């Protein structure tokens, strides 16, 4: 009895009930098997109709190399609703419920296909073993055959003919083609689970049918409520306006959202793959992307690259931020599935478009409104998304920027003011140290400069503080000279003033100053040489005779018209170079022999520069007298070339010039 029950259970599960000619069994057992076989055939006839429907819809859902998926890279968007067969009302109760349950289970199982792990496969196999022992043979056999080997049982293009196939020989032959009889243990079934990824996921659909059927009635109520809500609002273009293709697209989105909330998965923003997959459902075959939503809402909604280009619009409130974020993230993949959400702030566009008060995306008008800048902004308006019109308005309200030339002039004036302030502070600092008498002498000297020594036509501004003209072309050319940092030392201040004054002079005055500097440098070198020779030991008499002779020849023969006394220009340049009023106190404190500084200060204390130049004239005469001695000796024939007539004539000329200088 135990062996018979085990064999009967094996025949029920694996379908191993084929007859053989050499097998003999008792009549009673044979009759019971025939009765059971007839019952199995009757149940198979009804079960095969539902199985055929499941096969057809499952093949339609899979992304295989089918004929309807070759042209379209995306799956059919309305496979969950619009692919229902037009059956009669008599069998709609049973067939439609099973068919809808299967479709809903496949829609809900879409995300599960991409989240399978090794542990999940083990749980599926354990669940399958439980279902093998609990399900009846016919139901289990039909479901497993349909889910594991759908390509063998479904044929595309037959349509409703699949529902009426009830050939017993064909059914038995199909079982033989599947090699179902070759599976003899649970190890073979386990190997079947391990072979294919899609097979394990398909078995999970069978387990999810029972949970989906319970919520199917609730989904139908939501769909009916949505249809009633859409019919309450007037639509442009179509009065009754819901097409048979646009409704399933919305239903698919609702079901996917409900499944995601039921499973506790992350939001749409955290799963871009699921969002892109749901966006693909809105694409209809043979129509553009904008057609379903244009028929549903009566206006065209901008698609890709529309989230970042909607200008002159009010920002949505906090309640619609999710819809705007989803539209920004799904840029280039289709329209947002939150279009049914009413929003009064998004409906009021910047151009007064009130054709659709329930649009989540504002319509961009082709003509700019002239009073855009006068509109009131919502409190949640983001200043970072200001439009080009507002930016232009702000730019016109702001003052014009400074040109590079104006910036340069401003920088130069600032540096000049800093230099003058530094000079004034320096003078004030040293003026407290100088006695009152010395300060009065210094002021008298400074007052005598422009009156007695300076040519008022050319050099009247040498001692005055320079005035700066921003429009001067010379200052613009010399603007690089003023870019350096201001030095607090008096030497730099004097040099700065000298450069500024020279920049205002003409070419003739500059040439005179250049010649004066050259002559002053030459006279300084001569004085330095004279002082060195007077305090040093003379090595030979020949050197003392040759050097003055060569200098005298160069001075009197080459430059016969050179002035004996310096001109006012030379004196003015010398005063600008060497005059330091704050060194008077230090010069008075110096003890010992008279130094060049004390001699200069002594001449400056007299107050007028003609008196100051008397000492220089005396020194020049002394130098001339020293040069006359060698010249006289040369005239008497002491020179080696005394025999030549040319040298004698030169000596005579030099002697005569020396006599004139003495007179």
Swiss-Prot record:
Expression sites by tissue: Expressed in roots, stems, leaves, seedlings, cotyledons, inflorescences and siliques. Highest expression in root tips, young leaves and vasculatur tissues.
Localization (cell): Nucleus
Expression induction: Circadian-regulation. Maximum levels of expression in the subjective morning. Up-regulated by a light pulse in the middle of the night via the phytochrome family of red/far-red light photoreceptors. Up-regulated following a temperature upshift during the dark period. Repressed by members of the TOC1/PRR1 family of clock genes.
Outcome of gene disruption: No differences in hypocotyl length when grown in complete darkness, but longer hypocotyls in plants under continuous white or red light. Lengthened circadian cycle.
Positions with biased composition (Basic and acidic residues): 602-629
GO biological processes: circadian regulation of gene expression; entrainment of circadian clock; regulation of DNA-templated transcription
Region of interest called Disordered, as start-end residue ranges on this chain: 528-549, 590-663
This protein's record includes keyword Thylakoid: no
GO MF annotation list: transcription coregulator activity
Cellular component GO terms, alphabetical: nucleus
InterPro entries: LNK (IPR039928)
Superkingdom, natural source: Eukaryota
Alphabetized UniProt keyword annotations: Activator, Biological rhythms, Nucleus, Transcription, Transcription regulation
Biased amino acid composition, Polar residues: 639-648
PANTHER family per UniProt: PROTEIN LNK1, PROTEIN LNK2
Its biological purpose: Transcriptional coactivator necessary for expression of the clock genes PRR5 and TOC1. Antagonizes REV8 function in the regulation of anthocyanin accumulation. Involved in red light input to the clock. Activates clock-controlled genes with afternoon peak. Mediates light inhibition of hypocotyl elongation. Unable to bind to DNA, but recruited to the evening element (EE)-containing region of the PRR5 and TOC1 promoters through its interaction with the DNA binding proteins REV8 and REV4.
Subunit structure, interactors included: Interacts with CCA1, LHY, REV4 and REV8, but not with PRR7 or PRR9.
Protein name from the UniProt record: Protein LNK2
Organism for this UniProt entry: Arabidopsis thaliana
Gene giving rise to this polypeptide: LNK2
């Amino acid at each position: 009895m135990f062996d018979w029950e085990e064999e009967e259970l094996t025949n029920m599960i694996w379908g191993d009930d084929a007859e053989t000619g050499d097998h003999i069994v008792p009549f009673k057992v044979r009759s019971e098997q025939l009765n059971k076989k007839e019952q199995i055939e009757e149940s198979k006839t009804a079960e095969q109709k539902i199985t055929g429907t499941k096969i057809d819809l499952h093949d339609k859902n899979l992304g295989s190399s089918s004929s309807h998926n070759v042209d379209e890279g995306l799956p059919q968007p309305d496979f969950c609703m619009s692919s229902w067969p037009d059956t009669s009302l008599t069998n709609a109760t049973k067939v439609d419920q099973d068919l809808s349950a299967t479709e809903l289970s496949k829609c809900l199982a879409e995300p599960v296909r991409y989240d399978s792990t090794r542990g999940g496969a083990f749980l599926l196999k354990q669940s399958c073993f439980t279902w093998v022992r609990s399900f009846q043979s016919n139901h289990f056999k039909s479901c497993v055959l349909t889910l594991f080997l759908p390509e063998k049982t479904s044929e595309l293009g037959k349509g409703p003919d699949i529902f009426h196939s009830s050939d017993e020989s064909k059914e038995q032959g199909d079982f033989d083609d599947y090699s179902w009889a070759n599976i003899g243990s649970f190890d073979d079934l386990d190997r079947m689970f391990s072979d294919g990824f899609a097979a394990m996921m398909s078995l999970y659909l069978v387990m999810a049918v029972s949970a989906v059927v319970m919520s199917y009635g609730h989904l139908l109520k939501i769909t009916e409520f949505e249809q009633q809500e859409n019919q309450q609002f007037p639509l442009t273009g179509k009065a009754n306006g819901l097409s048979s293709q646009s409704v399933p697209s919305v239903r698919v989105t609702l079901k996917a959202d409900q499944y995601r909330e039921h499973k506790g998965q992350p939001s749409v923003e955290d799963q871009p793959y699921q969002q892109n997959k749901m966006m693909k459902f809105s694409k209809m075959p043979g129509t553009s992307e904008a057609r379903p939503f244009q028929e549903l809402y009566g206006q065209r909604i901008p698609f890709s690259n529309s989230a970042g280009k909607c200008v002159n619009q009010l920002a949505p409130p906090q309640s619609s931020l999710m819809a705007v974020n989803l539209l920004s993230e799904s840029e280039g993949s289709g329209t947002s599935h939150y279009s049914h959400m009413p929003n009064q702030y998004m409906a009021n566009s910047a151009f007064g478009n009130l054709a659709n008060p329930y649009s989540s995306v504002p319509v961009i008008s082709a003509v700019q409104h002239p009073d855009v800048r006068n509109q009131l902004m919502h409190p949640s308006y983001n200043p970072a998304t200001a439009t080009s019109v507002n930016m232009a308005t702000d730019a016109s309200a702001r003052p014009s920027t400074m040109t590079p030339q104006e910036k340069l002039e401003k920088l130069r004036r600032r540096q000049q003011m800093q230099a003058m302030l530094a000079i004034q502070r320096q003078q004030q600092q040293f003026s407290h140290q100088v006695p009152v008498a010395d300060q009065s002498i210094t002021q008298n000297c400074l007052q005598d400069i422009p009156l007695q020594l300076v040519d008022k036509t050319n050099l009247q501004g040498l001692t005055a503080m320079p005035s700066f003209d921003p429009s001067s072309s010379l200052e613009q050319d010399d603007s690089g000279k003023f870019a350096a940092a201001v030095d607090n030392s008096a030497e730099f201040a004097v040099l700065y003033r000298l450069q500024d004054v020279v920049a205002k002079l003409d070419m003739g005055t500059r040439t005179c100053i250049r010649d004066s500097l050259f002559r002053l440098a030459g006279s300084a070198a001569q004085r330095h040489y004279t002082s060195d020779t007077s305090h040093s030991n003379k090595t030979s008499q020949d050197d003392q005779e040759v050097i003055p002779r060569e200098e005298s020849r160069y001075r009197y023969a080459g430059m016969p018209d050179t002035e004996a006394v310096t001109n006012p220009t030379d004196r003015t340049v010398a005063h600008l170079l060497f005059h330091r009023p704050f060194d008077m106190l230090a010069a008075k404190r110096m003890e010992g022999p008279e130094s060049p500084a004390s001699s200069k200060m002594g001449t400056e204390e007299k107050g007028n520069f003609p008196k100051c130049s008397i000492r220089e004239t005396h020194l020049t005469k002394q130098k001339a007298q020293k040069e006359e001695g060698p010249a006289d000796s040369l005239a008497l024939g002491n020179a080696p070339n005394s025999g030549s007539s040319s040298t004698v004539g030169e000596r005579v000329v030099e002697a005569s010039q020396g006599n004139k200088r003495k007179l």
